[in-house]
Amino acid sequence: MMADSQPLSGAPEGAEYLRAVLRAPVYEAAQVTPLQKMEKLSSRLDNVILVKREDRQPVHSFKLRGAYAMMAGLTEEQKAHGVITASAGNHAQGVAFSSARLGVKALIVMPTATADIKVDAVRGFGGEVLLHGANFDEAKAKAIELSQQQGFTWVPPFDHPMVIAGQGTLALELLQQDAHLDRVFVPVGGGGLAAGVAVLIKQLMPQIKVIAVEAEDSACLKAALDAGHPVDLPRVGLFAEGVAVKRIGDETFRLCQEYLDDIITVDSDAICAAMKDLFEDVRAVAEPSGALALAGMKKYIAQHNIRGERLAHILSGANVNFHGLRYVSERCELGEQREALLAVTIPEVKGSFLKFCQLLGGRSVTEFNYRFADAKNACIFVGVRLSRGLEERKEILQMLNDGGYSVVDLSDDEMAKLQVRYMVGGRPSHPLQERLYSFEFPESPGALLRFLNTLGTHWNISLFHYRSHGTDYGRVLAAFELGDHEPDFETRLNELGYDCHDETNNPAFRFFLAG
């Protein structure tokens, strides 16, 4: 806030937030970002699609707005003591950049598994980095402890009125750039951006609908709305890490509950497809959470048959790990419903694959994985190009069933898409008493060694597959030879502390890998 104004606190009303947004001095650090028409997508979806380019900020995300708004309102005494926060991503860079502009010392606590590119970016903006903890929660606990011990001011990533007001400046720009919008789609992690955008728009132009978009595997706002209060998610997804928040903020929830018009969730494949749309239309390379709002917009348009409207979405960030783009490229066809993945049983005789392809009626086969395992039947993993999306996929399934083939649709099977497709043909030569688990490993030195020391010396590992996706965590698929009752194994899993899920009954595993 300006020197002659009082920072917000408590639970301000909408009018108070409006005044705070108007007074927020964010442009001492942030920029007015363009609102750009997506020509190709507008034509394809029969709506005017506009993108708010927050990737053009100095830190390549909207987080700078909220961080600077709060830090600029600190007292001289608070500034002298410095600030502290915990983050593995965009908020860390926003705080570091703001601290340099304000001449305030900033300590950013980041999990030890944080990618070097993110650590280097924070240091490049002038922030001091402390690597601590295996995850965000441990890093946050350390930051709060240091705040209390050394007098730092804690700068939260979303749940503070001044942070929310700072994010609300984006909405003010949006209305100044186009006052004829019908709907605005906003990504949600902790809710700071959604709260700020919604409260501002509803004060000035309440006829504009504000729709929140969440990742299906990190939908903390939806869970809170369903429960009537903020709740903890048992786990969050890793792909859209910028919105991977287990619990919505208290103040952000209060505002979202009051001012949002609707909410929609999308899966990772839809996010990948939206990232492709942004690149092809405006040559923006968004991070997954940055493309989240567009993914939700596309799904919302399809669900509600929207035509002829002016729709804006927020490209919230572009701090993407380059190595993660391989994963995006692989998955965007599925997200656009342009590919079907199928497990099909065909006779193990010459010409059977030719007959199968002929039945597909000239459709392109995008992927075919097979290895001889049985003299009578072959299980194949096949990808088929689609031109008419889900409707065509259903037609293919029906056609194959009518043709006498046993077929399982794996297009929505996460394990099949992530790992099994690269392992087809690895059946053991004899039956095994094995159980299959998927794990999320931190991408840090010693993670694999810890896994093997905890589990690999006590039980035989009969299958193992790891693949990096360019995020702070990797995905591992591992099978263990276990007896009928192995209580010690469950104990060891808990000791390991990695997020894991039993995948033994997964159809892709049964088709292609199980003994």
What residues fall within each predicted segment?
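PLP-dependent amino-acid enzyme catalytic core
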Residues: 1-447, 451-515
